[in-house]
Amino acid sequence: MIVITLLVGILFWIGIDIWAGITSKWYKAVELNPNITSDDFSVLVPIYGNVKYLQNADYLRPYGDRVVLCTTSGESEEFYRDLEDIAIRYGFRIFRSNYVPRKVGRKRSTSGITRDTVVRDALLAAPLNSYIVCLDADTTAQEPLTHIIGALVANKADFASVTIVPQKKGPFIVQMQRHEYVVSMRARRIMPWLLSGALHIGKTDVMRQIMARHSLFFQGNDIESGIIGDALGYKAVHILAHVNTNAPDTLYSWWRQRIAWSG
C-alpha cells in the first residue's frame, strides 16, 4: 500500500510538470522594457534577530531612502545601534513595529509570524510611495527595481510575481531544485498570484488591503497573500524579472524546508 501511494504521488507530480510545461506556453508573461521605469516605490526589508542577516545592503544602496528596514520592538540595544549605523551609511530608513517576538524557553523565536507582522505594520503605519517591493534581506534582483515596477505600472496591474532563480552551483539536491523552480515559474504564467516571499511587488494600497486580511501564518504567507489578492479581484501578472535565491544545499536543510512548507 505504501509503495502504491508513493507511485501515485510521483505520477501526480510528473503530471503537474507536464501540465505546467504544456499549458504555460498558452499564457503570456510581462517582459521588461528598459524604456519604461518608475521611481515611485518603497522597498520593505524585514530584518530582526541579527543584522548579519541583512546581506543585500550594497545591492539596495542606489535606492537610498526608498528602502525601509522593518524590525521589531524586541531587539537588543546592540542590534538597534548596528541597524542605525547601516541605515545612516546607506541612506535607508528604519521602521520599528510594536510587535515583540515571543520567547521559547531561553531562546527568542525569530521565525513564525515575525516577518509578515513587521511588513504588515510598515504597510499600515509607515509613509510609503505608491508601489511596494517586498524583499527578503538576502535577496537581489538581476534587473533594476525601477524596471520591474515600471512593468507593473505599464500593465495596469495591482500586484505581481517574478521569476525566482536558485544558485547554479551545488550538489544534486540543488540541481533538482533548479528544475523544480523552472516548473514552478512556468505555473506562475498561468497563476501569477502565486507570490514568492523572496520578492513580490504591488500597489501600496492593494498590499495594505491584502495584509490587513492576512492570517500571518508563516509557512503559507506568500501564497496566502496572492490568494487574498485574487479573491479581492485584484489584477495579478507574472513579470519576467529574475530574482536570485539560495536553495538548500544539503539533504537535511532541504528536508527541514519541506517539512516547514507542509505546514
Where is each model-derived feature located?
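N-terminal membrane-anchoring/stem segments of glycan-assembly enzymes
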Residues: 1-37, 189
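Short, well-formed alpha-helical segments that are part of the catalytic scaffolds
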Residues: 50-63, 76-79
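Active-site-proximal specificity loops/subdomain of glycosyltransferases
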Residues: 79-83, 87-125
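Long helical/loop segments within the catalytic core of UDP-sugar-dependent glycosyltransferases
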Residues: 105-114, 118, 143, 149-218, ...
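Short beta-strand-to-loop acidic/aromatic patch adjacent to the donor-nucleotide binding site
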Residues: 129-140
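Acidic donor-binding loop at a coil-to-helix junction in glycosyltransferase catalytic cores
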Residues: 218-225
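Catalytic donor-sugar/metal-binding loop of nucleotide-sugar-dependent glycosyltransferases
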Residues: 226-244
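Active-site donor/metal-binding and catalytic loop motifs
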Residues: 239-255
